[in-house]
Amino acid sequence: MKFGFIAHPTSVGLKRYVKMIDLLQRNSTELHSGYKRDLWRRENLVPFMNFAKITSATGATCEGVIKYMPLVADEMLADARGIANRVVSGIEELVEDGAELVGLGGFTSIVGRRGEATAEKSPVPVTSGNSLTTYAGYKALMQIQSWLDIQPEQEPVAIVGYPGSICLALSRLLLAQGFSLHLLHRAGHKDEDELLSHLPEQYRSRVTLTSDPEDLYPRCKLFVAATSAGGVIDPYKLQPGSVFIDVALPRDINSDTRPDRDDILIIDGGCVTATDAVKLGGESLNVTIKQQLNGCMAETIVLALENRRENFSLGRYLALDNVLEIGELAEKHGFLVYPLASYGERIDRQRVINLKRYYHHDIYSDEPDTEQPPASQLAFIDAIIAQDPAREDTLDRYHQFINPMMVEFLKLQHCDNVFRRASGTQLFTADGEAFLDMVAGYGCINLGHNPQPIIDALKAYLDAQGPNFIQYISIPEQAAKLAEVLCHFAPGNMGRVFFSNSGTEAVEAAMKLAKASTGKAGIAYLKNSYHGKTLGALSITGREKHRRHFKPLLASMIEVPFADIEALRQTLSRDDIGALMIEPIQGEGGVHVPPPGYLRTVQEICRQTDTLLMVDEVQTGLGRTGKLFACEWEGIEPDVLMLSKSLSGGVMPIGATLCRAIFGNGPYGTADRFLMHSSTFGGGNIAAVVALSALREILAQDLVGNAERLGTYFKQALTDVAARYPFVAEIAGRGLMLGIQFDQTFAGAVGASAREFATRLPGDWHTTWKFLPDPVQAHLKAAMERMEQSLGEMFCMKFVTKLCQDHNILTFITANSSTVIRIQPPLTISKAEIDRFVSAFATVCDELSTFLE
């Protein structure tokens, strides 16, 4: 059976989209067949999509055609009689195309007395689609009610658009479930008895009528809307926790884009999604229109699949039996109300559950109490602390309160793990599944997770009730010990230490020290470097993607090309440059190791130009590369040295900025200046106790030697695997700081795709391209190149995904390069664990080796 469907754009933007499709379609036909006057004539309907064959989940089939009437709602209402005639003409066009049933979308049914007048003139049966639209809205609300764990008698529901056919049917369904309703009608409906007459008498006591939306905002948090006018409800007046199911089109929320509120949820109601078992015509690359189909169109498809050539869903009164029947038939054929969506984007159960606190005030309370925390507040925090959350609970809590994009990114990569326990090189989920950690907190966890000697030292200090944050009213004993140990082991003649809480703070301290001790504003840094994301550290980070959104950054910071000695010499010879910030290995830059002798030459130039040499060992320091400090590989003696990450074995935040005593005494050696740089938490005894224990264990367990021995073995084993696969460009790094550089190039792929389509599609699209304006061509070419780059990054991320999903191994990319996977395991890693990684890496390489160049 073949159906037809008459849609219409629901906004000016969609009308212009249809206009674009129409222009391109006619132009394509002209390019293929030549100019014909009839091709460029006024049309009643615009062709949009042909479904050559639709196969449902049951195996039933039908075919259909969708055409647009290129008018928005206001244009239709301005000439309702004329549009009604155009709808009938459109039906006749579809019948000529073989349609045996025609669906009327949105206003194309409203202008014909909700389809009744249209049906009288139509040569074939018609449907408004309102029954399945109603069913979808109803099921969405029932699911929301279940997820929020509320009973019908607890929360009233606002119905916006009563007594329209959808709202009337919804009202009757909800009243039968026990809900109380607030019905919003047009201001012109004054006769309340007449309005109530549409509802069964036994339910009318649970109904409140109003024509003013303002009445709804303080009374209701659950809304279902289906007006013909649209734009009725102000989303910024909704109560926190409100769920607004916007059934059908036009939108009844007065916003074309998602409102900037996290405490409400607006759901695209009245839609269904086809399951994988449904085939809507030819499908290629899993690309087809199957999600969030309007209920009116889906109802037409379902009736065609059932071979039901009958009028359906006509008039104001939709038979509830029909509503429930078409819903069940839709589900049978594979058209489901779930997943739900908001402005086209999927939403899941937890997104709704996050709103429960606005409904269950016995558990969640915001009542203030100035004297003492009320019992409800204590109950809330006690419940949070005691909770044994499911993985999804944690993901959604993080999504709601910390970083939603991070959660969505990890979900996209299938790496959205939540770990409960950690030991050594392993991380464990709540159900005990173990993962090998090859990231180790980006180099923090040198001693492995929860190293017992450090835990014992920390417990002993706490059990002895040792003091912690006393550094500005007394002299902290443990911090003093740690400073001496660091100065003893660090290369060069270090004599001063400033403690902080992180690597970026250590860098900030070094920058201030450089300015104060040299009297010069400028600091040089290397291209592709990474020193942190606070404003100062970002100003000397050589990667534009981290910087662009925070400009202007600090002035007088000068970038120098990596490994370019002459450029460095010229820069450091400038009068305004007082210091150079450098990493012995660019970790986040993609694990770039400088050429042999480069660092030694850098030191010589710094000495010749009287430039402060500041070495950032936040990631490379304390054994990671096979030396206690990576700069020792070339005998470098910095003027300033920065440490963090593994300084505490990853157990506690700590950073340290070391310098020669002469540089520390100068800017901070007077009565007015000795407290010019300070940190509330920096230099606390507890962090120092942990750091002292960590340094001891690095030496006691010979982790520096372990990093060198196993790192050499590891790098060679990976290199042997990589030699078989040209998409692995290099195994870079030193010790147990390695990077796998991928080069699966897609250069030219998008351009070739465009040319292929231009060649295969009807017409001469190559000529069309030639006459696009130069700026348009330039932007399209830039977009194609960036897309090709993104495909290479996507390929790299598939390694991260497959190592995680298939082998329970955790890896990640570097901050500056999305085509480099970092390998920075705990220095306690065993040879067997390295072999496990190499084997898994080889397997993934083989599985992703369909294309070799």
From Swiss-Prot:
Signal peptide: none annotated. It holds the Pfam family Aminotran_3. InterPro entries: Aminotrans_3 (IPR005814), Aminotrans_3_PPA_site (IPR049704), Class-III_PLP-dep_AT (IPR050103), NAD(P)-bd_dom_sf (IPR036291), PyrdxlP-dep_Trfase (IPR015424), PyrdxlP-dep_Trfase_major (IPR015421), PyrdxlP-dep_Trfase_small (IPR015422). One of its GO terms (biological process) is antibiotic biosynthetic process. One of its GO terms (molecular function) is identical protein binding. Its EC number is 2.6.1.-. Disruption phenotype: Cells lacking this gene show a white phenotype and produce 4-hydroxy-2,2'-bipyrrole-5-carbaldehyde (HBC), 4- methoxy-2,2'-bipyrrole-5-carbaldehyde (MBC) and 4-hydroxy-2,2'-bipyrrole-5-methanol (HBM). It comes from the Bacteria. Its cofactor is pyridoxal 5'-phosphate. Pyridoxal 5'-phosphate binds at residues 503-504, 680. Keywords: Aminotransferase, Antibiotic biosynthesis, Pyridoxal phosphate, Transferase. SUPFAM superfamilies: NAD(P)-binding Rossmann-fold domains, PLP-dependent transferases. Gene3D superfamilies: Aspartate Aminotransferase, domain 1, NAD(P)-binding Rossmann-like Domain, Type I PLP-dependent aspartate aminotransferase-like (Major domain). Transmembrane segments: none annotated. Pathway: Antibiotic biosynthesis; prodigiosin biosynthesis. The modification N6-(pyridoxal phosphate)lysine is found at residue 645. PANTHER family: AMINOTRANSFERASE CLASS III (PTHR11986), BLR3010 PROTEIN (PTHR11986:SF121). Belongs to the class-III pyridoxal-phosphate-dependent aminotransferase family. Homodimer. Involved in the biosynthesis of 2-methyl-3-n-amyl-pyrrole (MAP), one of the terminal products involved in the biosynthesis of the red antibiotic prodigiosin (Pig). Catalyzes the transamination to the aldehyde group of 3-acetyloctanal, resulting in an aminoketone, which spontaneously cyclizes to yield the dihydro form of MAP (H2MAP). This is Aminotransferase PigE. It comes from Serratia sp. (strain ATCC 39006).
